């Protein structure tokens, strides 16, 4: 694809001044027409990303693929907590005595693994590993466990819980985004039982997608935190779901959000990270989202302004893994998750650049450092991390979110 603007000497996605080019395109419009113009611009960026990106051949070593033995270890961690009701941390608004009920009664499909969102991504973990390793020893047990959860009755109970007026913001965006990841994994799996589960989940999937789309459309400012509320990390998960679910409207909404929130960002202070309880990086999370929306050349230019200190020399120290001080503390254990998510975000950023970009090797080297620091900690020794870290480990080691 070689789209160019009349009178311009270069394809529009390689022009150095992105904001000026967008002004050239959209300045004549106001109000809704200007918004539509900006949406179109970002949608075209997405088309370039899909059309121009060949299978990745960027420099720097790629990590080893997930093997069946390691997958079995991660599956065991998810199976251990999938239907373990207690201990449980519920985010639940009570309006009367009648609302004081057990987790199993409140959310009958996703009541284990300490909290709702962790149980959702434990289900995602099992579905992804079953899809990747259909003949593994853990697969029959995982099938039975997921089948116990994803029944029409249980999902009807989940939907009834969400649709109460006082729960309009439940698990937004983190838990709802991971629910869409679960739905995407089921959609992508060519398996009769997966198709059945996907069909059972469709009402809940539709509810989650509608809530996230409406929220992203009316959100005035991005949420720049290192925990559950971060918009960029959630948008990445939802963007990938929209591709599998063939939802161009969702992608248009997210592309417009990318333009409003992030396209003009410069000099992200990566040296200020991490905060003490982060499990997401603010800077890397944003870049990992933007590489999905922008084509490789446009993303390469944007990244140069956003993270200008990425070295072109892979031997130069750049980003060290964060240090975990106490894995028995549920908040301090977030740091293991930070190292895991940093690793997949760094790999994603490298994957989003042109094959010849000299920053790729340094990005991959930093990703490997974080991978090596984090994966040995995914043991389940402490339930504070054991109930959720395996999902992050599987997202990383199975290449989720990569081309």
Label each region the model flagged.
Residues 53, 58-111:
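Low-complexity, Ser/Thr/Pro/Gly-enriched N-terminal "stalk/linker" regions
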Residues 12-13:
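Tryptophan (W) side chains
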Residues 58-66, 76-80, 120-136, 177-193, ...:
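Well-ordered alpha-helical scaffold segments within catalytic/enzyme domains
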Residues 105-108, 120, 129-242:
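Extended ligand-binding groove/face enriched in aromatic
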Residues 63-68, 103-120, 160-176, 218-231, ...:
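Solvent-exposed loop and edge beta-strand segments that line ligand/cofactor-binding
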Residues 37-46:
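Bacterial N-terminal signal peptides
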Residues 243-388:
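Long, repeat-rich segments with strong aromatic
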């Amino acid at each position: 694809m070689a789209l160019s603007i009349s009178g311009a000497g270069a394809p529009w996605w390689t022009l150095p001044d992105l904001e000026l080019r967008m002004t050239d395109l959209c300045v004549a419009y106001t109000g809704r027409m200007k918004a539509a113009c900006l949406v179109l611009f970002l949608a075209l960026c997405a088309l370039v990303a899909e059309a121009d990106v060949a299978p990745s051949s960027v420099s720097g070593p790629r990590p080893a693929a997930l093997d069946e033995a390691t997958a079995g270890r991660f599956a065991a961690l998810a199976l251990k907590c999938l239907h373990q009701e207690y201990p449980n941390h519920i985010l639940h608004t009570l309006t009367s005595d009648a609302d004081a009920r057990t987790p199993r009664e409140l959310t009958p499909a996703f009541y284990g693994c300490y909290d709702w969102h962790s149980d959702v991504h434990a289900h995602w973990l099992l579905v992804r590993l079953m899809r990747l390793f259909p003949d593994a020893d853990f697969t029959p047990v995982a099938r039975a466990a997921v089948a116990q959860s994803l029944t029409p009755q249980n999902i009807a109970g989940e939907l009834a819980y969400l649709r109460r007026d006082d729960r309009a913001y439940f698990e937004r965006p983190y838990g709802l985004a991971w629910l869409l990841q679960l739905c995407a994994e089921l959609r992508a799996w060519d398996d009769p039982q997966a198709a059945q589960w996907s069909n059972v989940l469709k009402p809940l999937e539709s509810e989650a997608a509608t809530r996230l789309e409406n929220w992203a459309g009316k959100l005035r400012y991005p949420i720049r935190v290192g925990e559950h509320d971060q918009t960029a990390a959630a948008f990445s998960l939802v963007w990938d779901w929209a591709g599998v679910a063939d939802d161009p409207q969702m992608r248009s909404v997210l592309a417009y959000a990318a333009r409003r929130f992030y396209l003009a960002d410069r000099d992200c202070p990566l040296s200020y990270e991490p905060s003490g309880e982060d499990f997401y990086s603010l800077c890397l999370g944003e870049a990992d989202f933007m590489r999905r929306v922008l084509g490789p050349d446009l993303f390469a230019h944007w990244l140069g302004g956003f993270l200008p200190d990425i070295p072109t020399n892979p031997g130069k120290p750049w980003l060290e893994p964060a240090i975990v001080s106490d894995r028995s503390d549920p908040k301090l254990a977030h740091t293991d998750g930070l190292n895991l998510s940093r690793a997949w975000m760094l790999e994603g950023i490298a994957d989003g650049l042109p094959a010849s970009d000299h920053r790729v090797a340094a990005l991959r080297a930093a990703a490997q450092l974080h991978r090596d620091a984090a994966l040995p900690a995914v043991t389940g020794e402490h339930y504070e991390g054991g109930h959720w870290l395996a999902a992050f480990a599987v997202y990383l080691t199975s290449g989720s979110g990569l081309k």
